[in-house]
Amino acid sequence: MDVQTRDGRSRNHPGYLWQYGTPGGAAIFEFRMGRGREGPMRFLENFAGILQTDAYAAYDRVGGPKMVHAACWAHSRRRFVEAIKLNQQDVASTRIVAQMAKLFAIDAQARDENMNFAARHALRRQRAPSVLSELKAQIEAASRTALPSSPLGKASSYTLRLWHKLTRFFDYAELELSNNLAENSMRPVAIGRRNWTHIGHEKAGPRVAAILSIVETCRRLKIPVREYLAAVLPGLANLSFQRLPELTPTAWAATNL
């Protein structure tokens, strides 16, 4: 998003919102004036768990020894879909997208049947190996025949390069196939960017991030935002700093919903 310069006359400069979150949990936005790895490196310095991202290079050196880095199948699929849009006769991309649909269908079945992680893990182990084997064979075949600079060639290279990260879900039942949840959380930012035009000062960035964190966490937890704010704001000034965690959307939902 554009950030207005201090004098208000010079050209605006870019600011960036980074978003971190967990399925069924909070969404945390962090404002940074740069797009380099310094932001996620600092935020995730002591993180122990699974980090699912796209292939942006800034994520390659973040996290500690207890962090597992996973990739997103939706980002891979999108590249083959774009190849089809550019060439309707791209049989290889069409077949690959159809094979990916079989992979997503496994998790769709788990959702439809309200499976817990253990049951989903068993279903994946039963059905995913053959799907993945055929999918990888199709992509490897495409990579041998497509020009490296073509959309199909780039999509194939991208997917094969990230294959070990894309298949992490096979070992971690709690890992989703895609990080669409995070991408969906960024849509209000994209809409707002068109409406806001810019933010007035870089010091306003963290405040914007805090507001977005509260609103998006409420949305994820199905908390009525107005009801939540009406409940927590009146007593906020009289609450000690140590007790502020009691007023987060997650904590409030645990006792009020």
Regions from the PLM with identified roles:
Residues 1-257:
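Catalytic center-proximal scaffold of phosphoryl-transfer enzymes
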